[in-house]
Amino acid sequence: MEATSQQFMSQSYLNAQETTTRATKNYLTSLHSTRKQPSKPLKRPAISSPLNPMHPHVYRVEPVNFKVLVQRLTGAPEHETVQAKPLKTSDDAAKQSSSSFAFDPSSSWGDFSFQNPANISRW
């Protein structure tokens, strides 16, 4: 009976070892495998050509004006020159505001006596 149980134990042990060995082998071979090429190459849909193919524009130019034409075609687009309105400076604003304050009797801004350094020290 002992011989049968030992043989059974050793057989189950060998089967377990064989299973782990196969699993390890499969794992190692998967690490070293390369990706197979697809059986059929992928075909991309062909881009249909337009019904009316575009023809390049042909410029007829004198050799003297060639440089000007090339610069005009390859250069930056020309911008329209728009004159900017002059900015109001603080001097202009002060002139406008001082005249309005001078004629407004209810405005306290018309009194410029507080700008004197002697008057500032009293505050």
Swiss-Prot record:
Localization in the cell: Nucleus
Keyword Hydrolase among record annotations: no
A GO CC term assigned to this protein in UniProt: nucleus
Keywords (A to Z) from UniProt: Flowering, Nucleus
Amino acid composition bias (Polar residues), ranges on this chain: 109-123
UniProt-listed Pfam families: VQ (PF05678)
Note: Plants over-expressing VQ29 have delayed flowering.
Role played: May function as negative regulator of flowering transition.
Protein name in UniProt: VQ motif-containing protein 29
Organism: Arabidopsis thaliana (Mouse-ear cress)
